[in-house]
Amino acid sequence: MRYIELAQLYQKLEKTTMKLIKTRLVADFLKKVPEDHLEFIPYLILGDVFPEWDERELGVGEKLLIKAVSMATGIDSKEIENSVKDTGDLGESIALAVKKRKQKSFFSQPLTIKRVYQTLVKVAETTGEGSQDKKMKYLANLFMDAEPIEAKYIARTVLGTMRTGVAEGLLRDAISLAFNVKVELVERAYMLTSDFGFVAKIAKTEGNDGLAKVTIQIGKPIKPMLAQQAANIKEALLEMGGEAEFEIKYDGARVQVHKDGEKVTIYSRRLENVTRAIPEIVEAIKEALKPTKAIVEGELVAIGEDGRPLPFQYVLRRFRRKYNIEEMMEKIPLELNLFDVLYVDGVSLIDTKFMERRKKLEEIVETNGKVKIAENLITKNVEEAEQFYKRALEMGHEGLMAKRLDAVYEPGNRGKKWLKIKPTMENLDLVIIGAEWGEGRRAHLLGSFILGAYDPETGEFLEVGKVGSGFTDDDLVEFTKMLKPLIIKEEGKRVWIQPKVVIEVTYQEIQKSPKYRSGFALRFPRYVALREDKGPEDADTIERIAQLYELQERMKGKV
């Protein structure tokens, strides 16, 4: 299958904002895809090369990419760099360079999707001494044979700056439409495996029956079940039917642990493989987990010198560290508090009631200094739960989780079977969709950021406010550097940005607002942290903001 067909799909997707049209375009394309291509083409459509849980990274920045194009076209790197000032997009500038190419090999072959994919895999798997030169040559070989439109989208794929507006929900709907299968079965299969390539292939070859049989697989992370927030303990108990399991809510990073014999793999909430960054937890898991094969979930917490928990950002620092890991183990010791088990020795437990899963967890875990089981309380009594809540806060934790005793595990769902109880309103994780250049000495920096929440109905990120406080000068330098390559268009001092970067914000309150299409505005938002553990698909939705607005009003006693 020719790569130009995929490039033309990207171009069509870019030209429309209509979700239904995009879905139909992707579905029609998927119908034509050979069976042996379905394992990787869904990721290319998303603008990726690998699933998010795959450790492989391309490791190619703008400079290396420009050098590869220069090698392929004979056009000086500086000329390509200068062109970006006019086009505002490196992909467009690379397309222009290929159009002006000074030579094309006599043996040039039209690019196939398979060749492009296999080359990108080779680029990702090339490491060590001399790897940058090898990566450059692999890419140059693609650009030598590429048409301008192909070069544009190869470049965007390499840099992770595709602008087609295709996200997980749209791809799910397109798979359902292409292969005439139930969308809820596609959703379920994806939530269980986090692998669109696998799901698309099953949908095409085995239809609804095959999708219905999809189950958990060790080595493919499950989308985590999520919780809403309750106003207080009393509300949580009422929602749970009068009795609930209360667990300490740790201020850490949620992880999913897959054990397969001596092999242990640990995934972050965003399903990224963080195993190498936390070797002491890997060893502790091998000792603590009795079954040969198991999938468990827990909260990874950083512990301070006083034995109290440190903010979750410390855990993220551990995740990011690729070198001198032993030094970081000393500086930021970690502790894993397990709270659920989803799979044991060939048996999926997601359709098992929560209390049975909790008992199973206690049976299969032998706690040690690094691996513990989350402290809990099962009660019908509000006062007893209040005392537990008070103790959790005194210990430096975030609050409590309340869980329905008969709840099955619902991957990817944020329902009311799990509820958080915290002393303050929940912070929001929102996507930066635009920004404004600063004033005076900050004129060269982006100084305030337009925040967007995801609307699953349209696939858009809708504005809910603008944040300019809480940032240090260093933060603004870093955000400007990070966001500049993602700028889509400029309107005076305002720029619009590809929705890729998620930040956590606090706010005084949520207000209803006719000013924004979202219907809501944040009052006095303030930057808290960059959420590197979350992608745009993990950001808070308009529906979630509506739920928090109702919760806020209940807390005020207005509802």
From Swiss-Prot:
Domain of life: Archaea
Alphabetized NCBIfam families for the sequence: dnl1 (TIGR00574)
Entry keywords, A to Z: ATP-binding, Cell cycle, Cell division, DNA damage, DNA recombination, DNA repair, DNA replication, Ligase, Magnesium, Metal-binding, Nucleotide-binding
GO biological process: cell division; DNA biosynthetic process; DNA recombination; DNA repair; lagging strand elongation
This protein's record includes keyword ATP-binding: yes
Purpose: DNA ligase that seals nicks in double-stranded DNA during DNA replication, DNA recombination and DNA repair.
Presence of keyword Protein biosynthesis: no
Reactions catalysed: ATP + (deoxyribonucleotide)n-3'-hydroxyl + 5'-phospho-(deoxyribonucleotide)m = (deoxyribonucleotide)n+m + AMP + diphosphate
Residues reported to bind ATP: 247, 254, 269, 299, 339, 414, 420
Entry's EC annotation: 6.5.1.1
Origin species: Pyrococcus abyssi (strain GE5 / Orsay)
Name of the molecule in the record: DNA ligase
